[in-house]
């Protein structure tokens, strides 16, 4: 059966740790191999994301593969949802794997019995597994491989990265405290944390979210008006509540994230570039993971 990575649950604890360590072990993130030679990946993006398209395309092409991209236009999403059996059979005829971006509930919408090729979730509103694996690699670097020392604070609106962070607590021993803006759906996240069987500290203010944290996430700002955006931003005053030398991660693209002061983004405190590098590493290892178990000779 094909292997899929729609959420971290598809990898499990052993697979999640393995991919993080393998990704960290790649000598050069942009190094070129021939692993994907004669393989084609189709990218189905229901929403635009230049950053995700760039990262996934680079991973496939630097490994010798080919890309077919389809953006949000064209009506493919409703066609695939309505005629899943027929469309998946057609896609299987032409490509070797699929990346999907921007489809909510992807893990439950895909009928795995119908899919004869690997599917990787490049990001959805309720899961971004590759992002969290890459960010765990960042945390390991700055905790000297001891995630029990990682205290993570999230401020901002909900997105797939936050859902995967909560899911990641099943497998990785960091702690997580979360502050959501007033109009966000906190009960849904609390229910999800209970479903995952993990402990998340939900607090009320950005200051409480970063209190004592050595990793601070600037989450999504999609639900914030201009006045609220000024109250929910990462600046020196906010980081004064965090641990000394706290590192700042972005939970989404810079244009969609809670505002981070420009001097912080340009400082060693910002892990934006390391996050990007590690995502490239993780996507390369994900391709190895989904394909190797599918090779009959292995």
What role is predicted for each listed range?
Residues 88, 96-168, 250:
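Anion-binding alpha/beta catalytic cores of soluble intermediary-metabolism enzymes, centered on
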Residues 115-117, 174, 241-247:
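A short helix->loop->beta-strand "cap" motif at the edges of active sites that frequently abuts
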Residues 266-298:
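C-terminal helix-to-coil terminal segments
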Residues 195-270:
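Rossmann-like adenosine-cofactor binding region
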Residues 40-94:
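Active-site cofactor/substrate anionic-group-binding motifs, chiefly glycine-
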Residues 1-54:
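Positively charged, low-complexity intrinsically disordered leader regions
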């Amino acid at each position: 059966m094909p292997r899929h990575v729609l959420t971290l649950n598809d990898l499990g604890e052993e697979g999640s740790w393995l991919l993080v360590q393998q990704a960290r072990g790649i000598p050069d993130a942009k190094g070129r191999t021939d692993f994907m030679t004669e393989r084609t990946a189709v990218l189905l993006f229901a929403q635009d994301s230049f950053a995700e398209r760039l990262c996934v395309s680079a991973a496939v092409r630097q490994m010798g593969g080919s890309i077919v991209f389809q953006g949000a236009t064209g009506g493919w999403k409703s066609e695939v949802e309505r005629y899943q059996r027929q469309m998946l059979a057609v896609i299987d005829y032409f490509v070797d794997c699929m990346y999907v971006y921007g489809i909510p509930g992807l893990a439950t919408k895909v009928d795995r019995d119908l899919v004869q090729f690997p599917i990787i979730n490049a990001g959805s509103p309720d899961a971004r597994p590759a992002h969290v694996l890459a960010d765990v690699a960042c945390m390991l670097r700055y905790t000297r491989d001891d995630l029990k020392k990682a205290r993570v604070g999230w401020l901002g609106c909900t997105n797939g990265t936050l859902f995967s962070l909560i899911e990641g607590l099943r497998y990785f021993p960091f702690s997580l405290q979360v502050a959501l803006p007033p109009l966000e759906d906190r009960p849904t996240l609390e229910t999800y944390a209970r479903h995952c069987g993990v402990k998340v500290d939900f607090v009320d203010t950005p200051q409480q979210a970063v209190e004592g944290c050595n990793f601070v996430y600037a989450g999504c700002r999609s639900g914030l008006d201009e006045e609220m955006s000024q109250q929910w931003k990462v600046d020196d005053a906010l980081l004064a509540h965090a641990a000394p030398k706290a590192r700042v991660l972005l939970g989404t693209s810079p244009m969609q994230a809670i505002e981070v002061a420009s001097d912080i983004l340009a400082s060693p405190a910002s892990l934006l570039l390391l996050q990007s590098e590690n995502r490239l590493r993780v996507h390369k290892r994900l391709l190895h993971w989904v394909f190797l178990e599918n090779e009959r000779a292995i």
